[in-house]
Amino acid sequence: MQVHLSALGCRLNEAELQNWATSFQKVGYSLAATPEMADLIVLNTCAVTSEAARKSRQTVRRFHRSNPEARMVVTGCYASLEPQKLEQIMGVDLVVDNSDKDVLVDKVKEVLDIPVMPEFATEPGESALFARNRERAFIKIQDGCRYRCTYCIVTVARGEEKSRTIDDLIDEINKLHAEGIQEIVLAGVHVGGYGSDIDSSLYQLVENVLERTEMPRIRFASVEPWDLGENFFELFANPRLMAHMHLPIQSGADSVLRRMSRRCRTEDFAELVNQARTQVAGFNVTTDVIVGFPGETDEEFEQTMQYIEQVGFGHIHIFTYSDREGTKAARLPNKISKEVKKERSRRLHE
């Protein structure tokens, strides 16, 4: 029995795929490289933008067309926000909410009742990651977010923060390293908020990873800039911690950041970047910017353009704002026209 696992969107979705790969193997599945080869398809969807939601629906239909005989399980943020719509799409056999992701394999066994051989589907020592030709592993360190940025639907889809224990994470990392993994990416919805619910912190987690594992290369997924304390960059004295962080600013205008309910001012962000570059040689900062947020004036956009040039990011992920039903931003007045958003995006891409 073969299962094809596919993720859209963030690195956290990819990390969850890796966990399911291991769990499916333990109950007798082997991993299919393509949906056409699979008896079961599991899709981890995204809903961060309206385009991501559209792509999630499109992918479900494409997978069903490519293999109409396969059973299909759909989970992830879009599945949590719009389960009724997914259930009406031909080919979808089971929709699993984000809150049930940890027991997804059990739900598949219980609801779909697909018979499999009760044995491992790979040779001893072969991991699910290598079956998927991967040498980098994404580690899910936490889920959920306690903040509510006005444009963000992910916090609605993912719920409250829940961190894994340091010991649990260390065990997983050491196991992956023993299997040959050379690089890990610490991922989550609110990576910088790790430990808020278990009296710990991201700093403590990284300290433990550096001290208790021999993983050669360690990276972070996106981290909110306000979560990093003054001593955080001291950790990069260890060369195993790669000198790069993705710190989303979203706008270079403080007035826009306030409407977004972001917890960082542009001045503070610039100081943080300067601190990182001062303490860590060759430190690379990448970021996210949203163009066309409701009410964004020409002056505010020009402030963003100037700020980007001032900070000098290594790379910028540019997102064109779109309303997401259920967010505060969707109810804000003074929406920006498609033409203006397109032009602002073009200018940022230059």
Predicted region positions:
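Proteins enriched for Cys/Gly/acidic motifs involved in redox and nucleic-acid/cofactor modification
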Residues: 1-193, 231-234, 245, 267-278, ...
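Conserved SAM/AdoMet-binding glycine-rich loop
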Residues: 73, 81-82, 86, 178-298
